[in-house]
């Protein structure tokens, strides 16, 4: 075969692996020759969208990444913030969207496993998981199948490994029918001095692979699944979905934490997307060193695996560490006690090259800089659409429906109904840190006392894809402020944010516009709040022949509060408490709302602008009042508007309320917009909020009464709110 023919064959192979012609030619230039099969496989993963962020990296540089509480920022396995008493909270959110759309149970389960490893890879013990989920309408059999599988997978992994699932969100919209979203967030706790980074260090030090054997599961996950659109052949991609074993991960977790306590590790990295290819390249790049890896030493689960398969396998429950040679015996002793496999598979070298050996034979030799830093970054070509690209939702409620019928319809809609049938599948109190559980408060609250700390932390995760589809900038501003509002409701000050940007194909102008405007909205709002991004994830190409998903930036925020016992609940807790409406003066509107969806209205091409500075000041006031101890109830007015928030507060503990609103119009009681809260407590605590709080009524009775609008018994409200349970029958 001629050299030209060989080049054509290799180029065809590169295309099949997701590389374009320009990228392949650039690889040849950086290598000084054509890559062989092993090298091409590694490059195809390291230069995939999932690993290289080639359509989003330039945008991400606009986000603020510095703050007074920040200990570890973007670029590490997870970010970390200080919470005082020498303690750190590490946290991150990541997506497992495409695998979950192909095989929902394993896709979601391994998504949880992966985010857990990210957290203990920096030396933190995982203490909580949250999830943000999106599916098509539940009238679809496929959506019910995906929901059931994903929720079961999350519960299986989290419950088995002993980490509580303390919060989350789930929404059902048509554009997620083919591309569900499964975003998992984890936070962990560590002493500040135990945090460890992933940079390989010390020429001559050993590279040790710990954990499960390596198999063929997950091969191509980063390129085949995570960096391309789904199509009708997605069932054929099931072999690229990883298989998880939470019990293996539990042993691995405890083993790694003990090794860190002993000071045995120089660096630690989990094996996630792209397996050994990514983990080793990133460790070498951050440490400015090289690595030699002998794939013949890697423990295998299957016979006759080729070197390239070993390098790109995404088998789960594996970690890579660097240790000094004299620490090997100690590591093997600890791993033996935890029944964790540990094999020295290579060493740190001087040259900044990743060499792959199969015994004595060198089967791959690549410059680390080319793998990690030289992937081309593409400029987006954004263009705002002249008309809405998403179809109007199906009408299920006539626009002539009165307030009584409208509230019941909203509460029974799958987007607003009680999530109890879902979160009851999760253990939310294991580890005995959880003080505020799902539907107990607007944010989860976990005490620090078991770890020797003072006070508590709060965490929330939020997204609002339909609102972002209406207006990518303002919708994202609302998502960030909503997350901060949830923390304010329990008296927590935000310390840091992690994000997951779920979008369609960035090569399409309208998706590029959505992505660019969304990042701009997030950056501007975070600077206004003074909150840094500690890390995150970008998931692109979430679309199919039906079109793109709603643009869905998901944000997770961690905050600190001085006393967990004082954290207000979202529901009314005592008869005779005064009820007040706290408002930042933001106009509540119906376009883009849950009510507009039920009415089958077209999505608007814009939302009212939000003054983030005004809302920030409101959040400061609410946070201060929540910490004072006099407010028993603080509930953010979000989806469905004020009437839904009042109904939720009534249903939490079966206490009614009688209120009189300054504006009883449908727009005012069902419209949406950030910056409003329902609060309840003793008169002095409510009045302490000053002019921001307008007393609107009292708690008591067995119904919700809104003067001039109507009344609803708690029985009929609860029956409507239980609609999601009926959907599972």
Where are these regions (language model features)?
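Glycine-/charge-enriched secondary-structure boundary and capping motifs
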Residues: 5-17, 21-23, 34-40, 178-180, ...
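Short, hydrophobic beta-strand segments that form beta-sheet elements in well-ordered domains
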Residues: 49-52, 165, 187, 678-681, ...
């Amino acid at each position: 075969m001629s050299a030209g023919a060989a080049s054509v064959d290799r180029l065809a192979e590169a295309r099949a692996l997701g590389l374009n012609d320009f990228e392949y030619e650039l690889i040849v230039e950086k290598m000084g020759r054509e890559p062989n099969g092993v090298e091409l496989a590694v490059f195809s993963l390291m230069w995939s969208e999932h690993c290289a962020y080639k359509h989003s990296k330039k945008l991400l540089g606009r986000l603020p990444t510095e703050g007074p509480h920040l200990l570890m920022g973007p670029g590490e396995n997870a970010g970390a913030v200080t919470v005082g008493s020498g303690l750190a909270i590490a946290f991150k959110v990541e997506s497992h969207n495409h695998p979950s759309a192909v095989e929902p149970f394993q896709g979601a389960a391994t998504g949880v496993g992966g985010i857990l490893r990210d957290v203990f890879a920096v030396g933190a013990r995982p203490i909580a998981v949250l999830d943000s989920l999106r599916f098509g309408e539940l009238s679809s059999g496929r959506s019910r199948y995906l929901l059931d599988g994903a929720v079961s997978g999350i519960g299986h992994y989290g419950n088995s490994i002993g980490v509580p699932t303390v919060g989350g969100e789930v929404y059902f919209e048509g554009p997620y029918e083919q591309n569900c979203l499964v975003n998992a967030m984890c936070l962990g706790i560590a002493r500040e001095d135990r945090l460890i980074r992933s940079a390989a260090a010390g020429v001559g030090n050993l590279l040790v692979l710990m954990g499960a054997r390596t198999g063929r599961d997950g091969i191509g996950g980063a390129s085949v699944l995570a960096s391309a659109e789904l199509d009708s052949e997605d069932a054929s991609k099931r072999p690229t979905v990883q298989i998880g074993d939470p019990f293996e991960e539990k042993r691995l977790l405890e083993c790694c934490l003990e090794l860190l306590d002993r000071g045995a590790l120089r660096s630690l990295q989990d094996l996630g997307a792209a397996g050994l290819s990514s983990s080793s390249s990133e460790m070498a790049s951050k440490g400015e060193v090289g690595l030699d890896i002998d794939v013949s030493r890697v423990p295998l689960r299957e016979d006759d695996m080729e070197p390239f398969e070993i390098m790109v396998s995404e088998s789960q429950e594996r970690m890579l560490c660097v240790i000094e040679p004299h620490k090997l015996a100690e590591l093997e002793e600890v791993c033996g006690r935890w029944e964790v496999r540990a094999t020295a598979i290579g060493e740190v070298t001087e040259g900044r090259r990743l060499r792959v050996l199969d015994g004595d034979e060198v089967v791959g030799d690549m410059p680390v800089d080319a793998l990690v830093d030289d992937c081309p970054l593409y400029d987006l070509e954004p263009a705002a659409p002249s008309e809405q690209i998403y179809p109007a939702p199906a009408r299920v409620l006539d626009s002539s429906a009165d307030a009584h019928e409208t509230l019941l319809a909203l509460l029974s809609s799958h987007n607003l109904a009680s999530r109890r049938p879902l979160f009851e599948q999760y253990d939310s109190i294991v580890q005995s840190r959880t003080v505020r559980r799902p539907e107990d408060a607007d944010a989860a609250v976990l005490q620090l006392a078991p770890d020797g700390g003072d006070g508590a932390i709060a965490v929330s995760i939020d997204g609002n894809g339909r609102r972002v589809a209406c207006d990518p900038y303002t919708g994202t501003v609302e998502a960030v402020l909503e997350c901060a509002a949830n923390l304010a409701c329990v008296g927590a000050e935000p310390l840091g944010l992690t994000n997951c940007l779920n979008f369609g194909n960035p090569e399409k102008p309208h998706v590029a516009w959505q992505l660019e405007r969304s990042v701009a909205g997030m950056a501007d709002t975070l600077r206004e709040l003074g909150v840094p991004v500690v890390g995150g994830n970008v998931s692109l190409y979430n679309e199919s022949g039906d079109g793109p998903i709603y643009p869905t930036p998901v944000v997770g925020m961690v905050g600190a509060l001085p006393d967990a016992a004082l954290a207000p609940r979202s529901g009314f807790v005592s008869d005779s408490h005064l009820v007040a409406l706290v408002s930042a003066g933001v106009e509540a509107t119906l376009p883009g709302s849950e009510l507009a969806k039920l009415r089958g209205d077209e999505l608007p091409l814009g939302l009212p602008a939000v003054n983030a500075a005004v809302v920030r000041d409101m959040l400061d006031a609410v946070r201060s009042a929540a910490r004072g101890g006099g407010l028993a109830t603080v509930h953010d007015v979000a989806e469905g508007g004020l009437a839904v928030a009042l109904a939720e507060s009534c249903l939490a503990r079966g206490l009614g309320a009688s209120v009189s609103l300054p504006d009883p119009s449908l727009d005012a009681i069902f419209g949406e917009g950030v910056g409003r809260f329902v609060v309840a407590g003793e008169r002095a605590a409510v009045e302490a909020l000053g002019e921001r709080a307008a007393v609107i009524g009292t708690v008591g009775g067995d119904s919700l009464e809104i003067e001039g609008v109507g009344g609803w018994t708690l029985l009929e409200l609860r029956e409507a709110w239980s609609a999601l349970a009926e959907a599972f029958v």
